């Protein structure tokens, strides 16, 4: 080749025209690893925020579960272990991870670079194993209840919790010592993690399968079995409810009387005796309580009692509580899987860190799993919310969580009554008591000139309707009758009805024959109303004599004074706790069985003159009695103001008092009870 040719080629490819490859520098807001500064700042803020919420929430949960015995059960022991693992994760791991995001790299030495991932992966394993243990506990409780008490004893529970911690951290020891993989700094992710050793071995896959995949499969299998058993149980309950005519949610008279003479002369109905309590709440269940009145007079042995279902109601309520905890644990497991799933997918799909934002998001989700559990407890469990209140507001645990215990003015018997399945938020309760005894005629019937009839198939019925929001009225004297509206004069030949309608929104206690109406006091300020025997009545030995208000159930009901009957009672106390009505059932010592009263024939109908006298007496307007509000008496009253005697009515009331020969019980009690 000539020199000209060579020169032309050299001119054609001058150094200035030679193509070169230029490497652009990274942007100013991106570090050498590819993570932007704004992204690292966001990750640091979220990490420190999760750390604060996690430490406060998990510490509050541990203190609340240890302080409040109401929520202290087998599941709570594993939940405490879970909270301790999350607390250690938030207190020991997250501060260093937050500083890593702020500084952009790891600057805390090689020892901490090995220790921090050891604690991190160990706590992750403990958390998932504790969730698996709680799920197994729910599985045994719901599907194999007969084995529950034998498996979950205190020493076995301690062994299970210790096994979770030892297994999770024991699996990390070979990696910590460098025998099977090693803990070191990963420059691509700028974090300390599990690295391959000099032989190329790593424990990531084994730890992932052993501490994550297997517990998840066990949890899924247990919940599948739990849902199957619950579904079958609901199907059986629906079939049983269809056969037994499901109980409606509204109030209705659940207990019926024995054979009673009706006001219009209709044939009486035969219903067995017993006592049933039904609450107007969201529950469709009622509780049957057998009549505990000992030895009713007059054919009481032949009356059958209603079967008791208190034990069934306790079992239903316990199963509902267990199912509520089971759903809460399921929510914890789902949140755990959702939080750990992103980092698992990102590390497998993006090994070369081509999308840094996905890695930051996966780390934040991983840290979020340590603080989300207390939030689930607050949302899904009412008892846990109350337990948190006891710690936050420094309230006694017994007063808030055990409103029917000694801390709130009620007795242990009332707490046992609540365990029968009655709802806490019921607004109205009907209590009907059947007594297998002789029939007690009302005062108005005796005043009309008729004599009480007693047969072996007739029994007194007394019903109480307790309304949680009614005026608290009480008469100041037991000799003053309550105001009653004037009855309408019936047409000629018809039997007059002596049943005055009860005043609206006022607590009443009436006989089933409608012979009288009586207002009862009701107090909301956690006051207990004792009853000395209003559930049964006693017939006077002389059939011709008119029964007194005390013996016929016509007296004034007063706190601490049982003037509505002299017989034995099955319900001894009515306690108001907030808006709840607690009925305390108490066994009484047996009393001798009274002899049956003599059988008497029905008297002939009264002559027309006597009937006209009765009608004139009914048309007479009684004196207006004096009432006072028990809830708001005058404060700091003097002795004379509290004990102003009220004159008794002339005529009938004075005669009744003289015939009894005893002073009024209301006048004996000089002071009204304090609020």
From Swiss-Prot:
It comes from the Eukaryota. Keywords: Cell membrane, Disulfide bond, G-protein coupled receptor, Membrane, Receptor, Transducer, Transmembrane, Transmembrane helix. Coiled coil: none annotated. Residues 666-675 have a biased composition (Basic and acidic residues). One of its GO terms (molecular function) is G protein-coupled receptor activity. Belongs to the G-protein coupled receptor 1 family. CDD domains: 7tmA_GPR84-like. Required in glia to regulate the acute sensitivity to cocaine and to continuously maintain the proper blood-brain barrier (BBB) function. A moody-mediated signaling pathway functions in glia to regulate nervous system insulation and drug-related behaviors. It holds the Pfam family 7tm_1. Disulfide bonds join 113-192. This is G-protein coupled receptor moody. Residues 552-565 have a biased composition (Gly residues). The lineage of its organism: Eukaryota, Metazoa, Ecdysozoa, Arthropoda, Hexapoda. The keyword Cell membrane applies. It is a multi-pass membrane protein. SMART domains: 7TM_GPCR_Srsx. One of its GO terms (biological process) is G protein-coupled receptor signaling pathway. Residues 1-44, 95-115, 178-206, 349-359 are extracellular. Its main location: membrane. Residues 278-294, 536-551 have a biased composition (Low complexity). The chain crosses the membrane at residues 45-65, 74-94, 116-136, 157-177, 207-227, 328-348, 360-380. It is found in: Cell membrane. Residues 66-73, 137-156, 228-327, 381-675 are cytoplasmic. Residues 258-316, 475-568, 588-675 are annotated as: Disordered. GO terms for cellular component: plasma membrane.
